[in-house]
A protein has these predicted regions:
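Short beta-strand-to-loop acidic/aromatic patch adjacent to the donor-nucleotide binding site
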Residues: 1-10, 221-234
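Conserved donor NDP-sugar-binding/catalytic core segment of glycosyltransferases
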Residues: 14-46, 231-275
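Active-site-proximal specificity loops/subdomain of glycosyltransferases
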Residues: 207-220
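Short, flexible, basic/aromatic active-site loop/helix in glycosyltransferases
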Residues: 44-65, 272-296
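Catalytic core of nucleotide-sugar-dependent glycosyltransferases
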Residues: 126-152
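Cell-envelope/extracellular polymer assembly enzymes that use nucleotide-activated donors
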Residues: 94, 174-178
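Short, acidic, metal-binding catalytic loop of nucleotide-sugar glycosyltransferases
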Residues: 189-202
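Nucleotide-sugar donor-binding/catalytic module of glycosyltransferases
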Residues: 1-129, 143
């Protein structure tokens, strides 16, 4: 196995023990990563703990959330040819993406095992210190998408090191839209907002009082969208964005962010497993959230 570390960063005392335990417990552990935090130049203070999700490929295509500690089987690194000079500044991001493509098992250790050193010339403290790294990161994602055969456009977001992928969608894709609600006026207004913002997607519209009323024989298209009739769509091409992710065989359900227009807060940004309520509910619309999760 090979572990990636910056020369001035620190490992937790039990970091290698935890990695070896993961390897021993999981024979298919090709890639392993852990949580991390930051540490001041004088090692006096640790801060900004990053408690990461288990492996999430769409999140990884938006930001190198894996980062540190990253451990990979040596045979995989040899197979892909190691680092590539063309991606200097984001060579670890490029390597991680290529390793992920080959890995059979990807495991997350939910413990802080890595302390990222912060100083003025590091991206941990000053994202503007290595601007070339962000273009390299964008190119790394583009190369990854080509490698896995998933055409899409990558654009940089406002904050450095964060990206958005828009996947190519088949031109003749259709969606059956099921409006849920009793108010006919709401249904008409919701339908109007969808037609105005959905983009070039064929749509079939069905109105029902509850989801239970939808019958399989009514559904004409490959994808089904359930929408509360009180909702109004405002972003352009949101439907194609949803289909872009839903079209892949590993994905079955896709949601979008809902906002409260009256007070400009997030109403719904996904469900929280094991907890009541919705992710980031009540946060300001412009908030980026915990490690930019609101934004991504």
């Amino acid at each position: 196995y090979i572990a990636l570390l910056d020369h001035d960063d620190l490992l937790a005392p039990d970091a290698l023990f935890e990695v070896v335990r993961c390897v021993n417990d999981n024979e298919k552990a090709d890639v392993i990563y852990s949580d991390e935090d930051k540490i001041t130049a004088d090692s006096a203070r640790r801060f900004e703990p990053h408690f990461k999700t288990d492996f999430n490929i769409e999140l990884l295509r938006s930001n190198n959330y894996i980062c540190h500690l990253f451990v990979v089987k040596r045979l995989i690194v040899e197979e892909i040819g190691g680092f590539r000079n063309d991606f200097d500044g984001a060579q670890d991001y490029d390597l991680i993406l290529r390793c992920i493509e080959k890995a059979e098992g990807i495991y997350h250790i939910p413990k802080i095992l890595y302390h990222w050193r912060v100083h003025q010339s590091s991206t941990a403290e000053n994202p503007e210190s290595k601007l070339y790294a962000y273009d390299a990161g964008k190119r790394a994602i583009e190369e990854h998408l080509k490698s896995v055969g998933r055409p899409g456009k990558v654009r940089e977001l406002y904050y450095r090191g964060f990206y958005h992928v828009t996947y190519k969608v088949k031109e003749k894709t259709g969606v059956t839209v099921c409006f849920v609600g009793n108010n006919k006026t709401d249904v008409k207004k919701c339908m109007k907002s969808i037609k105005k913002t959905a983009g070039k997607v064929k749509c079939q519209f069905i109105a029902v009082k509850s989801i239970k009323e939808v019958k399989e024989e009514q559904i004409r298209y490959e994808y089904v969208l359930f929408v509360d009739s009180s909702i109004r769509m405002i972003s352009k091409n949101w439907m194609r964005e949803m289909i872009g992710i839903c079209q892949f065989p590993e994905n079955g359900v896709v949601g979008i962010q809902l906002i409260n227009k009256k007070n400009q807060t997030i109403y719904h940004n996904g469900f929280l497993k094991g907890q009541k309520g919705y992710a980031f509910q009540g946060q300001p619309v412009e908030a980026v959230g915990y490690f930019h999760r609101d934004e991504l």
